């Protein structure tokens, strides 16, 4: 119940439908009942379409909110927007800077994860997240909710789903598969460019969203990965070694 798979005939239709989720969420927002969306970097093709739709419709976003899902961490703090892979930079350049200033939400309504996670976590209170969008990584993550390292108390078995679901926004060490994927998709194959840590939204915030929406155009995880997580979610087969299955 509550889980469905939607197929699109063309990439154009796919990314337009993804962009419309932003618009549909923001249309519900009012000053008394603000509404937002939590969105990914990967995919990104929808972002310029979002800006174009907002401008064409003349949709005021003054009360609307946006949460970034994650950001790179350089070992000391979040990377700046000068970093070539900065997610905040991508969101702003591909979407928000393209929205007419008269329509754009105030900067205080844009929430990007930082090394000090408290302001980001607090921003989820009092605002409705209509939808959390995401992609699926090779390691079966959403955001950077990778499988936890198999060491210490998790050496012989991964954490129980109920334990993993307690995790909130946090700084994480990234799985080697995630590093390789981002080098391939974003770094031109240069794995040394990819930070080994990140700040990610957690299951705690994910479960505050009214809906979780995962978009897969075939450029990130493999067909096998898509079929695997679809099967696990539809059958209620939950295992924290496959983080996407926790969405069941």
Language model regions located:
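N-terminal glycine-/serine-/threonine-rich phosphate-binding loop
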Residues: 1-37, 55-56
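Ligand-binding beta-strand-loop-alpha-helix segment within the catalytic cores
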Residues: 1-6, 59-133, 192-193
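ATP/nucleoside-binding phosphotransfer catalytic cores, i.e., glycine-rich phosphate-binding loops
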Residues: 3, 8-10, 18, 200-248
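ATP/pyrophosphate-binding catalytic subdomain of soluble kinases
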Residues: 20, 113-156
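Gly/Ser/Thr-rich loops at beta-strand to alpha-helix junctions
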Residues: 37-47, 135-141, 219-221
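A glycine- and small-aliphatic-rich helix-loop capping segment at beta-alpha/alpha-beta transitions
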Residues: 50-61, 83, 146-158
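Class I SAM-dependent methyltransferase SAM-binding "motif I" and its flanking Rossmann-like core
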Residues: 143-195
């Amino acid at each position: 119940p509550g889980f469905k798979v939607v197929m699109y005939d063309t990439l154009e239709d796919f990314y337009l439908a993804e962009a419309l989720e932003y618009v549909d969420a923001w249309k519900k927002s009012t000053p008394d009942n603000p509404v937002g969306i939590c969105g990914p970097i990967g995919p990104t093709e929808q972002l310029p379409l979002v800006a174009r739709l907002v401008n064409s419709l003349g949709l005021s976003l003054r009360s609307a909110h946006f949460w970034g899902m994650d950001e790179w961490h350089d070992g000391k703090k979040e990377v700046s927007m000068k970093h070539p892979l900065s997610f905040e930079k991508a969101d702003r350049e591909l979407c928000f800077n393209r929205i007419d200033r008269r329509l754009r939400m105030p900067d205080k309504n844009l929430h990007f994860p930082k090394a000090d996670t408290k302001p980001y976590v607090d921003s989820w209170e009092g605002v409705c997240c209509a939808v959390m969008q995401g992609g699926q990584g090779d390691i079966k993550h959403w955001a950077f909710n990778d499988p936890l390292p198999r060491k210490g108390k998790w050496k012989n078995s991964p954490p129980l789903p109920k334990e993993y679901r307690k995790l909130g926004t946090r700084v994480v060490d990234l799985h080697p598969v995630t590093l390789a994927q981002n080098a391939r998709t974003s770094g031109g194959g240069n794995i040394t460019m990819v930070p080994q840590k990140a700040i990610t939204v957690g299951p705690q915030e994910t479960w505050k969203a009214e809906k979780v929406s995962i978009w897969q155009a075939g450029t990130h995880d493999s067909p096998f990965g898509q079929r695997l997580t679809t099967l696990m979610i539809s059958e209620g087969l939950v295992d924290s070694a496959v983080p996407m299955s926790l969405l069941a």
